[in-house]
Amino acid sequence: MMMAIHTLRREQALDADVDAVFALFADPLNLEAITPPLLRFAVVTPAPIAMGVGTLIQYRLRLHSVPMRWDTLIQAWEPPRRFVDVQVRGPYRLWHHTHELTPLDDGRTLMRDTVRYDLGFGALGALAHRAIVRRDLEAIFTYRAERVPALLS
């Protein structure tokens, strides 16, 4: 069965230098502050978490009231410009999230997120994507875009 790979892209200019933005995302505990409260997101891996290629981070969350575990593996780690996390256990068949940071001439940073994901489940997964998942992901990343600037100030 072919995978139906979807892509979510977001860009945001942030009023902070690239080192400050990377430092924010280099600490997985900050994910709790930029994830909507409805998801009841919590990092399970004990702090401090030494980030780098091969780091495994475990989370707990609720999707539509369903409790689940999500394990993320850091696949690429290139401070302060880029890192990639992939889901190794969780609700998606594929979750590949590339974070890219580009310094701008005015001292700000352009943050780019590219998420490639697949739900699996064939036609049922396609229906769930159209009805629920795409909208949920857009809302999660919109919330994040609203929260990140406050954490950098």
Which residue stretches match the model-derived regions?
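Hydrophobic ligand-binding cavity/cleft-lining segments
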Residues: 1-52
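Generic C-terminal helix-cap and adjacent flexible tail
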Residues: 4, 150-153
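Short, surface-exposed coil-to-beta transition loops
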Residues: 7-9, 67-71, 94-98
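Generic structural detector for well-ordered beta-strands
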Residues: 11-15, 42, 60, 73, ...
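Glycine-rich portal/gate segments that line the openings of hydrophobic small-molecule binding cavities
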Residues: 42-89, 110, 143-151
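Beta-strand/loop substructures that line and gate deep hydrophobic ligand-binding cavities in soluble
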Residues: 84-139
